[in-house]
Amino acid sequence: VKLGYSNARVKAMKALLMQKREIEAIAEAKNIEEVFSLLEKTSYRPDLISGTLAEKTLADQIEIACTKNFSRTLRKILKLSPPDARASIMSVFEKYEIENIKLLLTSKHLKQSKEKIQNLVLETGILPRGAMSRLIAAKDVMEGLAALEGTPYASAIEKSGAKYEGNITPLLAALDDYYYKKMQQMAKQFPGEERAMLKMLKSVIDAKNI
C-alpha cells in the first residue's frame, strides 16, 4: 500500500519506453543517421535536439542524450518514492554511480580527455558533487583514486587489496564486488522479497561474468 502510488506512477512511465517495433527498426538501421532519425520520433527527442550537442558527432549526440534521459528518469523515480523508501532505492541506484566511477577510472587509464567523457556521466547524486568534480578533472588513475578518498568506494578498493599497477581490472572488480555484496545484505532486510531480489542480482552477476 505504501508504494502503491509510486508504483502506479512508475508503471505509467513505461509508456515512454521504446516499443519492440521501434527497437527492431533501430537494430535494422543502415547507418547512424537513420538511428538518429528514428530516435527523434521517440521520447529521446528533447535530449537529442539540445543546442549544446550541435557540434558533437551523431554517435556522441545519441550517447549523451541517452545519458541525460536516464539520469532524469532516475531522479524522477526517486522523487516519486516515499521518503522512508528512498535510502533503499538509492542503494539499488548506486550501481549507476559505480558505473560512473569505473567509466572515469578507465578513461584515466586510457588517457582519454575530460571533454570526451564528462557528458557520459549519469547524474545520480550519490557521490558528493565535489568528489565527482575532482574525479572528472583527475589527470590520471592515481589522482582519480585520491578524489575518492573518504568515500565507501575508496574503502572498498583498499579492503580488497586492489592496487593500480598499470592494470585497471582489479580496481573495477573491487567496485563490482562491493556493490553486489551490499545488495545481497540489503536483500536480507526484506524477507518476503529476498528471493526475487537475489534472483535479480544473480542474473546481473551472471551477465557481468559472461
For the regions a protein language model found, what residue spans apply to each?
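N-terminal domain-start signal
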Residues: V1-I210
